[in-house]
Curated annotation (Swiss-Prot):
It comes from Corynebacterium urealyticum (strain ATCC 43042 / DSM 7109). The gene is rpmH. InterPro entries: Ribosomal_bL34, Ribosomal_bL34_CS. GO terms for molecular function: structural constituent of ribosome. This is Large ribosomal subunit protein bL34. NCBIfam families: rpmH_bact. Keywords: Ribonucleoprotein, Ribosomal protein. It comes from the Bacteria.
Amino acid sequence: MSKRTYQPNNRRRARVHGFRTRMRTRAGRAIVSARRRKGRKSLTA
């Protein structure tokens, strides 16, 4: 039996999908601005 694929970890979650990580690249900034435009309550993890 294989283990479940999602093993929650808050530090990894922030490092991989967090705001500061998004702002580092041009594509990441585009993601954040698209979510702002759409009116998302939560921009990043």
